[in-house]
Amino acid sequence: MASQQIRIRLKSYEHGILDESAAKIVATAERTGAQISGPVPLPTERTLFTVLRSPHKNKDSREQFEIRTHKRLIDILNPTPKTVDSLMKLDLPSGVDIEIKL
């Protein structure tokens, strides 16, 4: 019989709330008796934007902005129905994007 697995991928611009959310998910899953693999830090995605400082001239004067997207991966092996229920009821911060695959 094949074992079931839940893969949770977390994304956020702030690594602090991302690690806090990952810790909550791991604690909830361990409390309900599931096996955990992770959180695994995935590579940080860096997006760079370059804009002109002046609206009309001075092409040499530019400003750069960046957005860093931090990612974590958590695998829950052999989840129980109690694990799934407690993960659905879990309250996480609003700055974290959660992607769940069964």
UniProtKB/Swiss-Prot annotation:
Pfam families, per the entry: Ribosomal_S10
UniProt xrefs under SMART domains: Ribosomal_S10
Q: Which domain of life is it from?
A: Bacteria
**Any one GO molecular function term:** tRNA binding
Q: Which residues form a coiled coil?
A: none
Q: Which UniProt keywords apply?
A: Ribonucleoprotein, Ribosomal protein
| GO biological process terms on file | translation
Q: Which GO terms describe its cellular component?
A: ribonucleoprotein complex; ribosome
**Quaternary structure annotation from Swiss-Prot or TrEMBL:** Part of the 30S ribosomal subunit.
Q: What does this protein do?
A: Involved in the binding of tRNA to the ribosomes.
Q: What is this protein called?
A: Small ribosomal subunit protein uS10
Source species, please?
Lactobacillus gasseri (strain ATCC 33323 / DSM 20243 / BCRC 14619 / CIP 102991 / JCM 1131 / KCTC 3163 / NCIMB 11718 / NCTC 13722 / AM63)
List the top taxonomic levels of the source: Bacteria, Bacillati, Bacillota, Bacilli, Lactobacillales
